[in-house]
């Protein structure tokens, strides 16, 4: 054990999910603000999700301005803490790995185990809240598209498939805004859950994320690609999710989440009085023609074509993250009226 003295002071709770609580905190020595995610390791599924995120975040050797950065991960057992590192031979770390692999608790259940992820603090809420509290703005739309495509290209270059890309998992940082002319910085967060490797186990062995097939059920219905519904997918599923997000952002398409009753940005297909996720509808009818734009009278031809390709039923017909980034840059800077 390293220390029983807290390094961070928790200020307030800023978010709560199915397997963790996020706090705004300050580093005692520097007073710098950070976000701290506290994950209780009381069930094998919690441990597995936490370790996946830790392995993905810690595998990234460089930083990107639009991807959340993991400062450190701290493992707590009762009142004692230690810094956790990938590949550690610490008995506590190995117990968590064993729990994840076996699907059953491999440590004394009477002890309280927690993982604390210390990350960038984002002060502007999430992309969903930010956009829906403001009028549509072409400059903001352009900035957000370019930032998201850059983040996705970076993740895929680092063999990371997000698997749950949606506006709620994209955070807003406004701390560096010097003037009202600057757009906020986006940070892709939660998810980052799968590091692809040729062996499936060695993160140091690179492989194309577009050839790394996954089968674990992941994602949120309205952003899931057809092949995710089937349970056999690659990184092209992230391209589909981003297509849903961009289409919804440009046209301000929203739906009401049936559980939370919250209004969310997201595209869908209408079937009678029902709204159906695009991916689910395409799984049932791969030849279905998507009506784009659905609310506006018109849309720039190149933008419309790109969104349709991102939402292709066949993942092989979608651009990869690197082509997507290039094409969005070309549309943003070469087509002066791209959004109309």
From Swiss-Prot:
Family recorded in the similarity comment: Belongs to the protein kinase superfamily. Ser/Thr protein kinase family.
> What's the catalysed reaction?
L-seryl-[protein] + ATP = O-phospho-L-seryl-[protein] + ADP + H(+); L-threonyl-[protein] + ATP = O-phospho-L-threonyl-[protein] + ADP + H(+)
Against Pfam families, the record matches this protein to: Pkinase (PF00069)
* Residues the record lists as binding ATP: 14-22, 37
* Protein name as it appears in the record: Serine/threonine-protein kinase PDIK1L
Q: Which InterPro entries match?
A: CC_SR_Kinase, Kinase-like_dom_sf, Prot_kinase_dom, Protein_kinase_ATP_BS, Ser/Thr_kinase_AS
PANTHER family on file:
EUKARYOTIC TRANSLATION INITIATION FACTOR 2-ALPHA KINASE EIF2-ALPHA KINASE -RELATED, SERINE_THREONINE-PROTEIN KINASE PDIK1L
Q: Where does the protein end up?
A: Nucleus
């Amino acid at each position: 054990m390293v220390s029983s003295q807290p390094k961070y002071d928790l200020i307030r709770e800023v978010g709560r999910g199915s397997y963790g609580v996020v706090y705004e905190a300050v580093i005692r020595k520097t007073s710098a603000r950070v976000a701290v995610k506290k994950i209780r390791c009381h069930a094998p599924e919690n441990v597995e999700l936490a370790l996946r995120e830790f392995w993905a975040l810690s595998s990234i050797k460089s930083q990107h301005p639009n991807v959340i950065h993991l400062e450190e991960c701290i493992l707590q057992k009762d009142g004692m803490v230690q810094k956790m590192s990938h590949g550690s031979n610490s008995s506590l770390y190995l117990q968590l790995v064993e729990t994840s692999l076996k699907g059953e608790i491999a440590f004394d259940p009477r002890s309280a185990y927690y993982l604390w992820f210390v990350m960038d603090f984002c002060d502007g809420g999430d992309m969903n809240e930010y956009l829906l509290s403001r009028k549509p703005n072409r400059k903001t739309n352009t900035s957000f598209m370019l930032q998201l495509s850059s983040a996705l290209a970076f993740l895929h270059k680092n063999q990371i498939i997000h698997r749950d890309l949606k506006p709620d998992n994209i955070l807003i940082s406004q701390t560096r805004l010097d003037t009202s002319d600057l757009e906020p910085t986006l940070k892709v967060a939660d998810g980052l859950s799968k590091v692809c490797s040729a062996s499936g186990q060695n993160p140091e062995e690179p492989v194309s994320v577009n050839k790394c097939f996954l089968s674990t059920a992941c994602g949120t219905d309205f952003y899931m690609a057809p092949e995710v519904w089937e349970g056999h997918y690659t990184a092209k599923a992230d391209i589909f999710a981003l297509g849903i997000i961009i289409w919804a952002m440009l046209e301000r398409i929203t739906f009401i989440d049936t559980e939370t009753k919250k209004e969310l940005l997201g595209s869908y297909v209408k079937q009678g009085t029902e709204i159906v996720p695009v991916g689910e509808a395409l799984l049932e009818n791969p030849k279905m023609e998507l009506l784009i734009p659905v609310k506006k009278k018109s849309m720039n031809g190149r933008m419309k074509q790109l969104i349709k390709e991102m939402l292709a039923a066949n993942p092989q017909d979608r651009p990869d993250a690197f082509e997507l980034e290039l094409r969005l840059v070309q549309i943003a800077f070469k087509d002066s009226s791209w959004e109309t």
